[in-house]
Amino acid sequence: MRWLIFICTSLFLFTLPLAAEDKVKVIDGDTIHVGKLKYRFLGIDAPEMDQVCKKNQQDIMCGVIAKNALIEKINNSPVTCKIEEVDRYKRLVAECFVKEESLSRYLVRNGYAVAYRRYSIKFVEDEEYAKQNQLGLWSMTFDYPWDHRAKLRSK
């Protein structure tokens, strides 16, 4: 029952701008911390921090690039998050915004992340745009983040 109250309260509270004193810390290309809360972006999957992509036979740390793109996009601006659910890792799965622009949409549309169809189809059109324009990941050879994680688990 407490979880239900927490979730209902959170759905209301966290659609408001997060407190200015709650500094946003970017963990990777699809996860941020705000204060003590951890937000996993809804419907997208960004490369892992250790993930290497290839472009013109050169290794590119595409997870680091995704994280840096998110840091640059947020740029100390206020972040607003709309919580959709709590995942099995107790992360708040949310769509977060800067200046009313979806960070998930920005990351996928610019090729820093892919649509995570297993959980949502909301950003599939944005992925198609990035793919057609060979933006970000789509200008490289890469493993989908979930395939990269599976390879690591199988070792």
Predicted regions span which residues?
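Small beta-barrel nucleic-acid-binding modules, primarily SNase/OB-fold domains
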Residues: 2-8, 14-155
